[in-house]
A protein has these predicted regions:
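Surface-exposed peri-terminal alpha-helical interaction modules
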Residues: 1-168
Length: 168
């Protein structure tokens, strides 16, 4: 039997959408084919769209703080490993700090990249990323897979604090 759970809270639904998109992104980036890197960029743009919600960052920070408070309540419990508890609380603290220190929304730094934004504006148009519409993008797709992966890693670097916060 398949069980479908419907989260009623819009904030939780948004976080689940982002979790899904980050999972897709981490599957696509390591691949070698240009089409996989095309869809990795599509996913980056989708993450930027979903993450553009004004209160998302504060919602994730509140969730991290809530989890930290719950875990602190387990201190002194003889059935809980203090070392494991300290490790998880440390991970939460690191994720909280990284996300809190990030200026603006996730992916906001990418909006300054005119080349990426030209792709973003054409990517939703059916067939809008043809080689004659975006010759520079077509040329990028012809680069070696490792070079494309390095570019993707550089572009998605600003998204990782949010991903790490969601993972916890």
């Amino acid at each position: 039997m398949v069980l479908y759970e419907y989260p009623f809270n819009e904030s939780i639904r948004t976080m689940l959408r982002l979790e899904h998109l980050f999972k897709r992104l981490t599957l696509l980036v390591p691949r070698d084919e240009p089409v996989d890197h095309h869809f990795a960029l599509v996913t980056v743009f989708e993450i930027m769209d979903v993450a553009s919600r004004a209160d998302l960052k504060s919602d994730i920070l509140k969730e991290l703080d809530r989890h930290r408070s719950v875990l602190l309540g387990y201190r002194g419990n003889p059935h809980i490993s203090e070392a494991a508890l300290d490790e998880v609380i440390g991970q939460i603290d690191e994720a909280y700090q990284a996300l809190n220190n990030q200026a603006g929304k996730a992916g906001q730094a990418l909006t300054a990249n005119e080349w990426l934004m030209s792709i973003r504006s054409r990517i939703s148009i059916p067939g809008g990323t043809c080689e004659f519409d975006l010759p520079a993008y077509y040329a990028w797709q012809q680069h070696p897979a490792e070079a494309r992966r390095q570019d993707l890693a550089r572009w998605i670097d600003s998204l990782w604090p949010m991903k790490n916060g969601l993972d916890l």
